Structures are given as structure tokens and as C-alpha cells.
């Protein structure tokens, strides 16, 4: 007859009416009993012939393609101008005095952050925006492109201008200026002995040697170039040759645009209209950038007719411009859904490309991307805004993967010891935390995102892609991309983006200037950054407890009034460092803090309400007697593992599940095992903080007997049959706890000390976890252990009782997690048998 849940509870000694522990508990270590129970609960039978279940409630396999939903109404979030102060170390020192070595080292790591992968694979531009939403391809394309544009405008991305130069917006850092040797750059054109271009520099090249030099001339340069000098470039056509001050020869743009006659560049050609054509279609530019040898000695200058800003129409008469979008203006509509109708909606479609405020030299960067991007909901609670997902997973894969640095994640007990108190709490929201940390420009060639432009993107989605002649955008192929779907999508998007549609239909390549989220290095750097800042804050405000995990920063103080005044000063301090806080999202928690998925109060720690709800849903949906795919089990174990420390039996209760995942077999829940887990997770007990104290209870064991020293009393007993030493030591610890009720026990066994009972016989592990819940262990060397003699059967000999002090740990080094964090600890071995046959490795 199968084991009922009631019997199983009794067996695990979870009920009060169990017999004496010294008799009952050693039985649970018996191999035969463990095997029989495993068979009864159907835990050992891993090979099943019935088809596996691949979905349980919301849990699907780990690699399942749960299709995210596209929202045509997505708003692109706005990004503040984030500029972390470069002299952050000095500013902190002015505030708190000299920094510790640790704080300095962490802050130097991120000023600037560096990224050197072993190998970078370059992907074609078509892969830049992932076709994640085939139904909404065009809409997704423009929304993503707009998101990238927003990031570039906010100074988070560099825009690749040529193989060796990039432009960006926002305040430059010193390492971005060094790349220009701080020299003034003139570049003159020798094409027709005509006018020269000037691009003036303020330590960085303000723009590349093409085009919109007009705006830059009106800026006061740090080198003191006055606007009048800037115009020396006009009118002195005698100056051929280039006056260049040690600038790398390829900072010139090689655009394949043939000038149709030369003329002055008039100041009236305002910066917009001078951008108007100089883009010379990125498409044609890119098609030969990657292959082009250096062009004429001073690069192709792009020359214009003398165009007043308003005359955007004259550009349709110039026969040369091969801009895909503007070409529709000259062509006859091919149907009612021809793009010509849309292009004729506006006179002035604005520039083909935009340029950043600053220009910079970069290592050789091909016209390719290294990762794809797509949009998803910002978070499950906010579906109105989008979030950009960047997939740089190439750096975590294959034999050339980068081994990301590990960093300390506070474990549950340390967190409770540190934060469980009667303080008042609030949490700060750092807006766009990752985008605070600057990346060295040398990393740009490895972290490229972008898009191939609308025509290529559309062509790739339709079957006609073969006909499009990308090189020349030849007329007869222009209308190949016209279709009803595209027309309707563009008309709707025109309402949102207006003339930006033109800009966004061009190809673009962007590199990260701040750390992106899709690289394993980023969580590490962010953790270093926030923990260093919190460390500084704790020293500056000794009566404030500041703590952080990634971008989650919490402040605690004795009273609400005190907390509010601290909040003001700390906010001002963080703002002075250039850290952007989102004041609307500051949460005041009162005395129970919500942090890292836990609720932490003076009583201890429990999982947050939404996790408790998830647990209930999970058990409601869990099928009985049908094999569940092990990948789905991984998901289930992820959730149950998070809450395991709050249950009676803890992790050991999940061991059968771990075993099936390890052997990659399906798992079948028997009614009893499901009922057992369900009851375990219905009543959650808080994890309490450890108190420091003196240890006065000691336990020790040999394979044949156990001994206890409780104050001045000594006790001993023998086992019916010899047991593996770790099992014996665990039993002795359980006896010590049940006899003395002490929360502090001295032991000389490292496995018991680690409080990981997953490698013991299954039933014993579950029972011991409940008996020893809330117990702290102190290590005592065997030679000094007062329980050593009784365990060997000698009660007469007394060793002096040690007074061993116990200090709870708050060390952040208690658990090293590989970044980004991995699923909860999977043990090396899972045994229903005893650990006797297993060479034990320390945890």
C-alpha cells in the first residue's frame, strides 16, 4: 500500500507524538528505509515511457520560446542626461575623508570600465534588429530605431561615423579627449581646388571633417578659436592640401557621393540643411566602407550646391542623391499603396543622418553589429513603456567565452543578520543604473548594435530580397518594397514620428558608451559601484545603515524624522556625484523592508507576498502522476528553492527533484510527495537573525556512538549499527538541540557546520533540517571538544568547558555567485543512500 501523507509526516518526525528522538532519528539514516520510501513515493523511478508534460501553469521549459507580446502603443522611456562625475573619488574624499583601499579599487574599476573579449564575431547589419515580432515587423523596426536614437541622444551610445571615428552627445570624459591628442583639426579638400571644410575641435573633434561645421564654428572653443577664424575655410580656395594635426588618416569620411559642381558653403546653409545631403546615403557609404581603400589624399569631401535652408525641393532635382527614401519623390506611384504618396506628404524630410556634438577617434570598427536588439515590456507591471533587450550572448558562449568575474551576493542569513532590526527603511530608485557607468571607447568595436536601414529590413522579410540592388538602389527596383502592409504601417508611424521616418529609414551603427545590460560584466560592475557608494555613505553618516544590491539601494535609520533628513542629505550627495535618482519611485517601507524579494523586519525575513502567491498557484497547477519535463522542473525548483529556507524541511525536501534534473529525466509527482511539499510551503516560518552569545552545548560522535556536553552534564549513547561519520555527527547535533533547546551548538564537523543537509540520506536530511532550524553552530577543534570523551564512551574524564563566543556573520562574501546569478545551488550528488560511498567534498 502506498505511503499516505499522514504516515510520511510521522515518519519524518514532523508530528509531536513521535517516540524518543535517540531511537527514531537514526532509523531515518537507514539505506533500506530510504529506498523503500523513494519507491513508495515514486521518486526513484526516473525512466518513464509516458510522454512528458512540457508546461505547468506559467512554467514552461527553460529554453521555451514564450513569445513576448508586441504593444503598438509602447512609449520609449526618456533618459536623463546621465554623467557620472569623473572625479568621483575626489568628491567622495571631500565628503568623508580618505577612502579605503577597497572603495578606491571599486571606483577605479568603473572609471572607465573596460571590456576585452577573447574573440568578437561580427554579424551582418540585417541581424541588428531581431525579427521578434513578424506580424509587426515595420512597427518594431521604427520603435527600436527610435529607442536607439533616444539612447544616442542621451549620450549612452556612440554613433559610428567612419571606420575610425564616432560621434556622441553629452559631456565628454577626459579619456575621450585624449584620443584626439587635443589638437585643432583642419581639413581641406583638393578635389576641384575648391572651398575647404573646417572642423574645429574643443579637445575632441567637434564633428568629423564633413558637413555641419557651421554650428561648431559658432561654439566658443576651449582652444579659443573665434567664429570669424572658423570661416577662414570659406573663400580661400588657394589652400589645397590638408592642414591636419596628427589625426589618423581615416577620420575622413569616404562617402560615395559625386559632387555635381562646386560652390561656396554658405553660412546660410544652416546645420540642418548642410546635413541634408551629406549623409550621401549611409547605404551606399556602408556598402563600400568596409572594403574601400583610402580614397583621394584628403578623402571625399561632399560638396553642395548653394542651398538656402528651405529649399529642400532642390534636392530632388540634383540627380545624384541615392537616398532610398527621397528617391520616391521623383518616381511615379506604382499603386495606391506606393511609398511615393507618403514621401510627398512633406516638403522637408530633414537630414539623412544626424551628427553628435563631439567626435572621437576609435579603434577600427567594421560596419557590422555584434549583437541584436529587440523591445519588450519595461516590466510585468508596466506594459506602457518598452525596454530594449540587447543580446550580446556571443560573449558567454562557446570555447572563446569570457569568464565573467564573480562577485559576492549576500545570502539570506547574512542579509537577515544585517538588516533585521527595528529601523525605519526607505529604498532609492537609481534611474537607468547601468547607464551610469562609462565604458572606454576601446570597447566600442565589441559592443555594436544597429540596423541595416528600412529597405533592407523590409526586403529581408519579403521574398523579393533578391531583386534589390543594394549598391545602387537602382530605380527599377525602388518599388519592390512597396506593399499595402508597409504603406499602412508607415502612415500610422508617420503620426508618431513625422519626418523622423526618413532619418530612421537609413542604416546606422552604434557602439555602447555606457555599459549595456546584455553583457555578464555589467552586473559585476554595477554591484562594485553601488557597494562602494553605500560604503562611503555608511561612513559619512555613521547612524545610517545604507546597503545595496545592484541598483537597489536601501537606507535605514532609528526614526522616521531622522530617516527623512538623512534622505535629503544623501540624495544631494548622490546627485553631486552625478547619480540620477528617480524621486517618484522612492519607497518608504516603515519598519518592514522589501528587498531582493524578501520582507525583512525585526522578527526576521520572509518571502514577499507575490512569491507566496506564485507558490500557491504553482501547487494548484502541479499535475499528479504525470511525468514533467526536467526543464520545467528546473523552473519549479527555482521558485521552490527561493522559499525553501522558510519551510520546515528546507532544501532537503527538494532533493528528489534535484536528482531528476541532474539525470535529465522527467519527474512524476506522487500524491503523497505533492501533499508533503504543498503543506511545507503553506506554512512559512521566518528566518530569524542570529544573536551573538557564548556556546555552552557541545556535540560529538564516532561511527558507533554519540556524546553531548550540556553545561557540566555529560551524556552518551550508542548507535544500533555503525554509521558514516557525517551522519553520526548530524544525529549528535540533533540530540544536543532536542535535549538542551540551545540555539548555539559547538561541533567539530564541517558538514554539520555548513548547515547544508542535502548530501545526507533523504529522510534524515528533511528531519534534521526541522530539528536544527534556527540553530547556529560554532566550530570547536576535536582536541578541545568537551563532548569528545563521552562520544568514545568515557564519561569520567572531564575536559574544561570552553567558553566559545559566537558572532553572527554579515559578511557579503558568504556566497559567491557567478554573475549574472545562476539557479539556486544544485548539489554535486543527490543520494537516497547514505554518504558512506561518497568521497565528501567540502561545501
Swiss-Prot record:
Residues binding Mg(2+), per UniProt = 429, 551-552
Region annotation Polymerase/reverse transcriptase domain (RT): where it falls in the sequence: 347-690
**Origin: domain of life:** Viruses
Q: Which GO terms describe its molecular function?
A: DNA binding; DNA-directed DNA polymerase activity; metal ion binding; RNA-directed DNA polymerase activity; RNA-DNA hybrid ribonuclease activity
Site, Priming of reverse-transcription by covalently linking the first nucleotide of the (-)DNA: residue positions: 63
**Magnesium keyword on record:** yes
Q: Which UniProt keywords apply?
A: DNA replication, DNA-binding, DNA-directed DNA polymerase, Endonuclease, Host-virus interaction, Hydrolase, Inhibition of host innate immune response by virus, Inhibition of host RLR pathway by virus, Magnesium, Metal-binding, Multifunctional enzyme, Nuclease, Nucleotidyltransferase, RNA-directed DNA polymerase, Transferase, Viral immunoevasion
**Region (Disordered) location:** 220-273, 289-316
Q: Which reaction does it catalyse?
A: DNA(n) + a 2'-deoxyribonucleoside 5'-triphosphate = DNA(n+1) + diphosphate; Endonucleolytic cleavage to 5'-phosphomonoester
Q: How is its activity regulated?
A: Activated by host HSP70 and HSP40 in vitro to be able to bind the epsilon loop of the pgRNA. Because deletion of the RNase H region renders the protein partly chaperone-independent, the chaperones may be needed indirectly to relieve occlusion of the RNA-binding site by this domain. Inhibited by several reverse-transcriptase inhibitors: Lamivudine, Adefovir and Entecavir.
The record's EC number reads 2.7.7.7, 2.7.7.49, 3.1.26.4
Q: Gene3D superfamilies, per this entry?
A: 3.30.70.270
Q: Which residues form the Reverse transcriptase domain?
A: 357-600
Q: Where is the composition biased (Polar residues)?
A: 289-299
Q: Where is this region: Terminal protein domain (TP)?
A: 1-177
Q: Which SUPFAM superfamilies match?
A: DNA/RNA polymerases
Give the comment on domains.
Terminal protein domain (TP) is hepadnavirus-specific. Spacer domain is highly variable and separates the TP and RT domains. Polymerase/reverse-transcriptase domain (RT) and ribonuclease H domain (RH) are similar to retrovirus reverse transcriptase/RNase H. The polymerase/reverse transcriptase (RT) and ribonuclease H (RH) domains are structured in five subdomains: finger, palm, thumb, connection and RNase H. Within the palm subdomain, the 'primer grip' region is thought to be involved in the positioning of the primer terminus for accommodating the incoming nucleotide. The RH domain stabilizes the association of RT with primer-template.
The family note in this entry says: Belongs to the hepadnaviridae P protein family.
Function description? Multifunctional enzyme that converts the viral RNA genome into dsDNA in viral cytoplasmic capsids. This enzyme displays a DNA polymerase activity that can copy either DNA or RNA templates, and a ribonuclease H (RNase H) activity that cleaves the RNA strand of RNA-DNA heteroduplexes in a partially processive 3'- to 5'-endonucleasic mode. Neo-synthesized pregenomic RNA (pgRNA) are encapsidated together with the P protein, and reverse-transcribed inside the nucleocapsid.
Q: What else is known?
A: Hepadnaviral virions contain probably just one P protein molecule per particle.
User: Can you say what this protein is called?
Assistant: Protein P
Q: Which organism is it from?
A: Hepatitis B virus genotype C subtype ad (isolate Japan/S-179/1988)
Q: Which gene encodes it?
A: P
Amino acid at each position: 500500500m502506498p505511503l499516505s501523507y499522514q504516515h510520511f509526516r510521522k515518519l519524518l518526525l514532523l508530528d509531536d507524538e513521535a517516540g524518543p528522538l535517540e531511537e527514531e532519528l537514526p532509523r531515518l539514516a537507514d539505506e533500506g528505509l530510504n529506498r523503500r520510501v523513494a519507491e513508495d513515493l515514486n521518486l526513484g523511478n526516473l525512466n518513464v515511457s509516458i510522454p512528458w508534460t512540457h508546461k505547468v501553469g506559467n512554467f514552461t521549459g527553460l529554453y521555451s520560446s514564450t513569445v513576448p507580446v508586441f504593444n503598438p502603443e509602447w512609449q520609449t522611456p526618456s533618459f536623463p542626461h546621465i554623467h557620472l562625475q569623473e572625479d568621483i573619488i575626489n568628491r567622495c574624499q571631500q565628503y568623508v575623508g580618505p577612502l579605503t583601499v577597497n572603495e578606491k579599487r571599486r571606483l577605479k574599476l568603473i572609471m572607465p570600465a573596460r571590456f576585452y573579449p577573447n574573440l568578437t564575431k561580427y554579424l551582418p547589419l540585417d541581424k541588428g534588429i531581431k525579427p521578434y515580432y513578424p506580424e509587426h515587423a515595420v512597427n518594431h523596426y521604427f520603435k527600436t530605431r527610435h529607442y536607439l536614437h533616444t539612447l544616442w541622444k542621451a549620450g549612452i551610445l556612440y554613433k559610428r561615423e567612419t571606420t575610425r571615428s564616432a560621434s556622441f552627445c553629452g559631456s565628454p570624459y577626459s579619456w575621450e579627449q585624449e584620443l584626439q591628442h587635443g589638437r585643432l583639426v583642419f581639413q581641406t579638400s583638393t578635389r576641384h581646388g575648391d572651398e575647404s571644410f573646417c572642423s574645429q575641435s574643443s579637445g575632441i573633434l567637434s564633428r568629423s571633417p564633413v558637413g555641419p561645421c557651421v554650428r561648431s564654428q559658432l561654439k566658443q572653443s576651449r582652444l579659443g578659436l573665434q567664429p570669424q577664424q572658423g570661416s577662414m575655410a570659406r573663400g580661400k580656395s588657394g589652400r589645397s592640401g590638408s592642414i591636419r594635426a596628427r589625426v589618423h588618416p581615416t577620420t575622413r569620411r569616404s562617402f560615395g557621393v559625386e559632387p555635381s559642381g562646386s560652390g561656396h558653403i554658405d553660412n546660410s546653409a544652416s546645420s540642418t540643411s548642410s546635413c541634408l545631403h551629406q549623409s550621401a546615403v549611409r547605404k551606399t557609404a556602408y556598402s563600400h566602407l568596409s572594403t574601400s581603400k583610402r580614397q583621394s589624399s584628403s578623402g571625399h569631401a561632399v560638396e553642395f550646391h548653394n542651398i538656402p535652408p528651405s529649399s529642400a525641393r532642390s534636392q530632388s532635382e540634383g540627380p545624384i542623391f541615392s537616398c532610398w527614401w527621397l528617391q520616391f519623390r521623383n518616381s511615379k506611384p506604382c499603386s495606391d499603396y506606393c511609398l511615393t504618396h507618403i514621401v510627398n506628404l512633406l516638403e522637408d524630410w530633414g537630414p539623412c543622418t544626424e551628427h553628435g556634438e563631439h567626435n572621437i577617434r576609435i579603434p577600427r570598427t567594421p560596419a557590422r553589429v555584434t549583437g541584436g536588439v529587440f523591445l519588450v515590456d519595461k516590466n510585468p507591471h508596466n506594459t506602457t513603456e518598452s525596454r530594449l533587450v540587447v543580446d550580446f550572448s556571443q560573449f558567454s558562449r562557446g570555447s572563446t567565452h569570457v569568464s565573467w568575474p564573480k562577485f559576492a551576493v549576500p545570502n539570506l542569513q547574512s542579509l537577515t543578520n544585517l538588516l533585521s532590526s527595528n529601523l525605519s527603511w526607505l529604498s532609492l530608485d537609481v534611474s537607468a543604473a547601468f547607464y551610469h557607468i562609462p565604458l572606454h571607447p576601446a570597447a566600442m568595436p565589441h559592443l555594436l548594435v544597429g540596423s541595416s536601414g528600412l529597405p533592407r529590413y523590409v526586403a529581408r522579410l519579403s521574398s523579393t530580397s533578391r531583386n534589390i540592388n543594394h549598391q545602387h538602389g537602382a530605380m527599377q527596383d525602388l518599388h519592390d518594397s512597396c506593399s499595402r502592409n508597409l504603406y499602412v504601417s508607415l502612415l500610422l508611424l508617420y503620426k508618431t514620428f513625422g519626418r523622423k521616418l526618413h532619418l530612421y529609414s537609413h542604416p546606422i551603427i552604434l557602439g555602447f558608451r555606457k555599459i549595456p545590460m546584455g553583457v555578464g560584466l555589467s552586473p559585476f560592475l554595477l554591484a562594485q559601484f553601488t557597494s562602494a557608494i553605500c560604503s562611503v555613505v555608511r561612513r559619512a553618516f555613521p547612524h545610517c545603515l545604507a546597503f545595496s544590491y545592484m541598483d537597489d539601494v536601501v537606507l535605514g535609520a532609528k526614526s522616521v524624522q531622522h530617516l527623512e533628513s538623512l534622505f535629503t542629505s544623501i540624495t544631494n550627495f548622490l546627485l553631486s556625484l552625478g547619480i540620477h535618482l528617480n524621486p517618484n519611485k522612492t519607497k518608504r517601507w516603515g519598519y518592514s523592508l522589501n528587498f531582493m524579494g524578501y520582507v525583512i523586519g525585526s522578527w526576521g525575513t520572509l518571502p514577499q507576498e507575490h512569491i507566496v502567491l506564485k507558490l500557491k498557484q504553482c501547487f494548484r497547477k502541479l499535475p499528479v502522476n504525470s511525468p514533467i519535463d526536467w526543464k520545467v522542473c528546473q523552473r519549479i525548483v527555482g521558485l521552490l528553492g527561493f522559499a525553501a529556507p522558510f519551510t520546515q524541511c528546507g532544501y532537503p525536501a527538494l532533493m528528489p527533484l534535484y536528482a531528476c534534473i541532474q539525470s535529465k529525466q522527467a519527474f512524476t509527482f506522487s500524491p503523497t510527495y505533492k501533499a508533503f511539499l504543498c503543506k511545507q510551503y503553506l506554512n512559512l516560518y521566518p528566518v530569524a537573525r542570529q544573536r551573538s552569545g557564548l556556546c555552552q552545548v557541545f556535540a560529538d560522535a564516532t561511527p558507533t556512538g554519540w556524546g553531548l556536553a550540556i553545561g557540566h552534564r555529560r551524556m552518551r549513547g550508542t548507535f544500533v549499527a555503525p554509521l558514516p561519520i557525517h551522519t553520526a555527527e548530524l544525529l549528535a547535533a540533533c540530540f544536543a538541540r532536542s535535549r538542551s533547546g540551545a540555539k548555539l551548538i559547538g561541533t567539530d564537523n564541517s558538514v554539520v557546520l555548513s548547515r547544508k543537509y542535502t548530501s545526507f540520506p533523504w529522510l534524515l536530511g528533511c528531519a534534521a533540517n526541522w530539528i536544527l532550524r534556527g540553530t547556529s553552530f560554532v566550530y570547536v577543534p576535536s582536541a578541545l571538544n568537551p563532548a569528545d570523551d563521552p562520544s568514545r564512551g568515557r564519561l569520567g574524564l572531564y575536559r574544561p568547558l570552553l567558553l566559545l563566543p559566537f558572532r553572527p556573520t554579515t559578511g557579503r562574501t558568504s556566497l559567491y555567485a557567478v554573475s549574472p546569478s545562476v539557479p539556486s545551488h544544485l548539489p554535486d550528488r543527490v543520494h537516497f543512500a547514505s554518504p558512506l560511498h561518497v568521497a565528501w567534498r567540502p561545501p
